[in-house]
Structure formats: C-alpha cells, structure tokens
C-alpha cells in the first residue's frame, strides 16, 4: 500500500520560488529541499530533475498570476480601477529588487530552453487574456484607447517592460512603479480626443 503523501507538491514549488528569488538560476535541488524542509530525495522523486522542477514552478506561477489578476480586479467596482489593479498585479510575486533580479536571471535561462520558452509564451498569453477581460469591462470609460487588441498589447508590453527595467534599476517599489506607468496610459485613454473621438 502506498504511503500517504504528507508533503504537498505546492510546498516544494513555493520553496523553489523563494530559492530562485534568493539564488537565481544557479539554485540546487538541495537548496530547495532545505527551504521546504524535506529531503533531496523527496524533491527528486516528485519532480525528477531540476529542469522538471523549474517547469513545474513555471506552470504554478502561470496558474497563480491568473487568479491574482482576476481577484484584485474583482475587488473594484469601477471598471477602470479594476483594469489598473489587474495590470499592477501581474508581477507582484517578483518581490523586492534583489529577488526580482534573480528571477530575471532565471528568465534568461528560460529563454534558452525551448520548453521553458513555450511556457513563458503561455504565461504571457494568460496575462494577456486577463488584461483583455478587464479591458472589455473598462473600454466604455476609455474613449481615447485604441481598439481592444492593441490596447491590451500595449498594457502587456508596459507591464513586462516595467518589471524588467525596475529589476535592473529599482527605484521605490515595483507596485508603485507599475501603478504610476499604468496610470499614465489609462489617464491618457480616459481623456476624450477633441480632434477625433468626442
């Protein structure tokens, strides 16, 4: 009879996320095991290899960002505030500047690996879909915005670019930086174009 699984996969995945934030792509399974307070054998048995663990961490992050963006958006009755919250909520899991830089280092590794690059594309598509969902609700209050497809692409490019720039040159918090830049775009879109739409 198989022994019950008392250590959840989520516990190991959360530990791996924290270790990557502290160490970057050079992390080891032993460091993850220590962080999760389990044996290296447990980590290896669950995930097989470091590469497979990273893929599982990526899948977990993709699922979590969708939940986070939708949850923070639904906390606002005002559609524009909800869109802002969704955009600002995209990369809050990066943490502070030092952990964000290490996650950025992991991103460089991800781009080399074709499987991880595919997972990154899926991650961005999930973010795009949540931004599109929020934008659809807010579009009526953003008369200066381009068509939905372009608007969502602009927001996705904005949050991706800000997160990378802030990771390299951190000033203040990431949430504040994202909020300021998202506000600049949404504020412009909220203003009616007197020469065109009006």
What is the role of each PLM region?
Residues 59-66:
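Short, basic, alpha-helical segments at the C-terminal edge of helix-turn-helix-like DNA-binding modules
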Residues 7, 11, 15-52, 56:
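Helix-turn-helix
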Residues 24, 48-52, 56, 74-77, ...:
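Residues in soluble alpha-helical coiled-coils and helical-bundle/repeat scaffolds
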Residues 102, 115, 119-133:
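Short, solvent-exposed amphipathic helices
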Residues 117-121, 138-198:
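Hydrophobic/aromatic-rich alpha-helical bundle segments in the mid-to-C-terminal region
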Residues 81-82, 94-118:
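Amphipathic alpha-helical segments used for helix-helix packing
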Residues 56, 70-100, 145-155:
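Hydrophobic alpha-helical connector segments
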Residues 15-22, 68-75, 102, 106, ...:
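Solvent-exposed, amphipathic alpha-helical segments
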């Amino acid at each position: 009879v198989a022994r019950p699984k008392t250590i959840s996969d989520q516990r190991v995945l959360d530990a791996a996320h924290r270790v990557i934030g502290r160490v970057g792509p050079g992390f080891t399974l032993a460091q993850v095991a220590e962080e999760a307070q389990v044996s290296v054998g447990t980590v290896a048995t669950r995930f097989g290899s470091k590469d497979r663990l990273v893929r599982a961490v990526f899948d977990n992050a993709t699922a979590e960002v969708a939940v986070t963006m939708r949850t923070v958006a639904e906390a606002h009755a005002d559609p524009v505030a909800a869109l802002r919250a969704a955009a600002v909520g995209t990369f809050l899991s990066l943490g502070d500047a030092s952990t964000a830089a290490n996650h950025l280092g992991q991103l460089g590794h991800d781009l080399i690996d074709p499987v991880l690059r595919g997972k990154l594309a899926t991650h961005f598509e999930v973010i795009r879909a949540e931004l599109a969902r929020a934008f659809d609700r807010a579009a009526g209050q953003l008369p200066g915005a381009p068509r939905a497809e372009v608007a969502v692409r602009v927001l996705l490019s904005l949050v991706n670019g800000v997160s990378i720039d802030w990771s390299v040159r951190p000033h203040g918090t990431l949430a504040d930086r994202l909020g300021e830049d998202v506000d600049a775009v949404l504020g412009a879109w909220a203003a009616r174009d007197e020469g065109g739409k009006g």
